[in-house]
C-alpha cells in the first residue's frame, strides 16, 4: 500500500510539473512571437522618436538648475 501511495504522489507531482512548464513555455513562445514577429519589429521602430524627445521646457531646466545650486 505504501508503494502505491508513493507512486501516486510522484505521478501527481510530475503531472503538475509538466502542466506548469507547458504554461510557462507557451508564455515564452508568445512573448518571442510578439517581439520577433513582423508587427513586433515594426512597432519597435517607433520607440526612437519618443526616447530622445525632451518633455521638459527650458524654464523647467532653469528651475532645476537653480534648485541644485
From Swiss-Prot:
The modification Phenylalanine amide is found at residue 36. Residues 1-23 form the signal peptide. The record marks 29 as: Important for activity. It comes from the Eukaryota. Its main location: secreted. Residues 40-69 form a propeptide. Keywords: Amidation, Antibiotic, Antimicrobial, Cleavage on pair of basic residues, Cytolysis, Hemolysis, Membrane, Secreted, Signal, Target cell membrane, Target membrane. The keyword Oxidoreductase does not apply. GO terms for biological process: defense response to bacterium; killing of cells of another organism. It is found in: Secreted; Target cell membrane. Expressed by the venom gland. One of its GO terms (cellular component) is membrane. Belongs to the non-disulfide-bridged peptide (NDBP) superfamily. Short antimicrobial peptide (group 4) family. Amphipathic peptide that shows antibacterial activities against both Gram-positive (MIC=10 uM, 20 uM and 20 uM against S.aureus, B.subtilis and S.agalactiae, respectively) and Gram-negative bacteria (MIC=20 uM, 10 uM, and 10 uM against E.coli, S.typhi, and P.aeruginosa, respectively). Is mildly hemolytic at its MIC range, but shows a strong cytotoxic activity at higher concentrations, reaching 84% lysis at 50 uM. This is Amphipathic peptide CT2. It comes from Vaejovis mexicanus smithi (Mexican scorpion).
Amino acid at each position: 500500500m505504501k508503494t502505491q501511495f508513493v507512486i501516486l504522489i510522484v505521478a501527481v507531482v510530475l503531472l503538475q510539473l509538466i502542466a506548469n512548464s507547458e504554461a510557462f513555455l507557451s508564455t515564452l513562445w508568445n512573448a518571442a512571437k510578439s517581439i520577433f514577429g513582423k508587427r513586433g519589429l515594426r512597432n519597435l521602430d517607433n520607440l526612437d522618436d519618443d526616447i530622445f524627445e525632451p518633455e521638459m521646457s527650458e524654464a523647467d531646466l532653469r528651475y532645476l538648475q537653480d534648485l541644485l545650486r
